[in-house]
């Protein structure tokens, strides 16, 4: 498979915006359905963000704040608070592999390979 960042034929602003949205939605909902290529790229961003959040430092909090969308959870907590207070402590003893990708059947309209990515 080719380099996922080159597949979209879009500029870096578009790619970064899509990745920010997908990672934010993944952390908010715990699982999302997207194309296989996007899921593989989201996995890297999400895992690095969770690993940095485990450090619980001011620098990691600022890095996450610059990347995540300003979404609010059901408990009226921001996504940043959810990441540092709930998600990161859950993976404290886990050295990596915080996400799992399931391959789904191809999409009807254009036969694109689909996948479900979820937090373990």
Swiss-Prot record:
One of its GO terms (cellular component) is cytosolic large ribosomal subunit. One of its GO terms (molecular function) is structural constituent of ribosome. One of its GO terms (biological process) is translation. Gene3D superfamilies: Ribosomal protein L17 (3.90.1030.10). Part of the 50S ribosomal subunit. Contacts protein L32. PANTHER family: LARGE RIBOSOMAL SUBUNIT PROTEIN BL17M, RIBOSOMAL PROTEIN L17. Belongs to the bacterial ribosomal protein bL17 family. HAMAP family: Ribosomal_bL17 (MF_01368). This is Large ribosomal subunit protein bL17. It comes from Mycoplasmopsis synoviae (strain 53) (Mycoplasma synoviae). The lineage of its organism: Bacteria, Bacillati, Mycoplasmatota, Mycoplasmoidales, Metamycoplasmataceae. The gene is rplQ.
